[in-house]
Design a protein with these regions (language model features):
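Short, well-ordered amphipathic alpha-helical segments that serve as non-catalytic structural scaffolds
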Residues: 29-45, 69-70, 98, 148-155, ...
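N-terminal extracellular/periplasmic Venus flytrap/periplasmic-binding protein-like
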Residues: 10-13, 26-35, 43, 165-260, ...
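Conserved catalytic cysteine-centered active-site region
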Residues: 27, 58-111, 143-150, 214-242, ...
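Condensing-enzyme catalytic core mediating Claisen C-C bond formation in acyl metabolism
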Residues: 1-28, 217-284, 288, 295, ...
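Glycine-rich loop/linker segments at domain edges
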Residues: 10, 16-19, 103-159, 213
Length: 386
């Protein structure tokens, strides 16, 4: 059976979604994606004529992200017209879904050489813009279950996750990301992008904007709950992921094709899985998705050397870690979304990118990327380093 392999993975620095301070406030998301696609082609030396499809995840497909943005990105990046494009939406799991279904295509003998990834600009296209939920949906679940912050609070209460637990987890995320930048560990994955600093000056952005080297427990403890009244709520802006802009991309193909083209893969897709959970506990989606993916891979959690578990909220990440009984030292070793950022449709590709480079640097054989997804889903992908 043909194996789906990853040749390289890159991403932009992740920007803060802020109208006055965001480094990408004047940069379009399709331009961000075109930059990483172009960089991927240049870094790998793959013949653009061999690229059959560009599959990108995105959650808000309107405005600059509308009209099949993946196809637009392919053309903006200078790929030939023969490179097709498809935009995929599984909310937060969109770009991990793009990666998974591209792998399925390779294994099934369909499209072979593909660029997969994702993009999101949460400043230009807010996540709730023009949202129109069918009222009949609330016959199946509560309105609160569709509000991610309330689901995080629900998990904190039902799983016994304290405010202190969440703040400490958030602090560690910033500390790990800060240490990784200081050690140059992101150099292999980040493609610098021109943007603007807070004064409006044009700058070359080389680091994730929301990582805070000065983060402290005292500062986190001073923040008020974001979704529930003080004294009741524990989820704050400090122990949740911020709003972000960014893009990421990976080059995928069959192993035989990589050999033919003289390209050295860094990993292969060992297994993928998705699942549904009750929307009220959407944050637990990684638990059954991980179990399903590991079963398909013929592995156990003990076999997994590194895990990228998307940090939508500290409460959600901690709930999954405890339910799966994961060794926390394996999780998000270079920081997670609380520090790095969570640009929705780009996040699955971002965590995969970070995971694959960390696996290479640390000589780890198996890695897991997994995410919770709004309205109650989970997605997981198991990678094996080559």
């Amino acid at each position: 059976m043909t194996e789906a392999v990853i040749v390289d993975a890159v991403r932009t620095p992740i920007g803060r979604s802020h109208k006055d301070k965001g480094v990408y406030r004047d940069v379009r998301s399709d331009d961000l994606a075109a930059i990483v696609v172009k960089a991927l082609v240049e870094r790998t030396g793959v013949d653009p004529e061999r690229i059959e499809d560009v599959v990108l995840g995105n959650t808000q497909q309107q405005g600059e992200q509308g009209f099949n943005v993946a196809r637009n990105v392919a053309l903006l990046a200078g790929l030939p017209a023969t490179a097709a494009g498809a935009t995929v939406n599984r909310l937060c799991g969109s770009s991990l879904q793009a990666l998974a279904q591209a792998a399925h295509s390779v294994v099934a003998g369909g499209e072979d050489v593909q660029i997969v990834g994702g993009l999101e600009h949460m400043l230009h296209i807010p996540m709730d813009q023009d949202l129109d939920i069918n009222p009949k949906l609330f016959q199946q679940t509560s309105k609160a279950a569709l509000h991610m912050g309330y689901t995080a609070e629900f998990l904190a209460q039902t799983q016994g996750i304290s405010r202190e637990d969440q703040d400490l987890f958030a602090l560690r995320s910033h500390q790990k990301a800060t240490a990784a930048f200081a050690a140059g560990e992101f150099r292999g994955e980040i493609v610098p992008v021109w943007g603007r600093d807070e004064t409006g000056r044009r700058v070359l952005v080389e680091v994730d904007q929301c990582v805070r080297p000065d983060c402290s427990l005292e500062g986190l403890a001073a923040l008020k709950p974001a979704f529930m009244p003080p004294g009741l709520g524990t989820v704050t802006a400090g122990n949740s992921s911020p709003l972000n802009d960014g893009a990421a991309a990976l080059l995928m193909m069959g192993r035989e094709t990589a050999d033919e083209l003289g390209l050295k893969p860094i990993a292969k897709i060992r297994a993928t899985a998705v699942c549904g959970v009750d929307p009220a506990v959407m944050g637990t989606g990684p638990v059954p998705a991980t179990k399903k993916a590991l079963k398909r891979a013929g592995l156990t959690l003990a076999d997994i050397g590194l895990i990228e578990l998307n940090e939508a909220f500290a409460a959600q990440a901690l709930a999954c870690i405890r339910m799966l009984q994961i060794d926390e030292s394996k999780v998000n070793v270079r920081g997670g979304a609380i520090a790095i950022g969570h640009p929705l449709g780009a996040s699955g590709a971002r965590i995969s990118c970070t995971l694959l480079h960390a696996m290479q640097d640390r000589d780890v054989q198996f890695g897991l990327a997994t995410m919770c997804i709004g309205i109650g889903q989970g997605i997981a992908v198991v990678f094996e380093r080559i």
